[in-house]
Amino acid sequence: VGEHTKPLSMINGNGLVNFGWARQPLFDVNMTAAASVHRHIFSAWRLKRWEYFYVATPTVFFAAQIAHLGYLANLTAYLYDIERNVLLERTSNIPFGTGVVLADHPRQGTTSARAGTSKYLQFEMTPEGKHITID
């Protein structure tokens, strides 16, 4: 147990967690493989997964997240104008997390969620970097 410096799976071949920490996103979160080994532990009600992204400048702070708690998903976006001391915030809850897709790795794939017909949040990793779509 200690610092990891190379990419690895968060769940090992026996379905157990590879303990340790990393200074950057190195873990592949293959929950499908883990769930097939330990169904009782990885039930839909026990898994908590999220993706969070933020940008901070001297004048503006922006943050967005998609959290899936098993029984509920939450979409949140914040924009804080530091100079004017104005906060804009939008939050939506999705019962049972229906339609929420979380990528297995923060540096690959797409994480997205839609609440109703108009609220949409997506994080997409491309060769150019992470793209965020908010509707």
Question: At which residue positions do the language-model features occur?
Answer:
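Targeting-peptide/extracellular-domain and disordered-appendage signature
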Residues: V1-D135
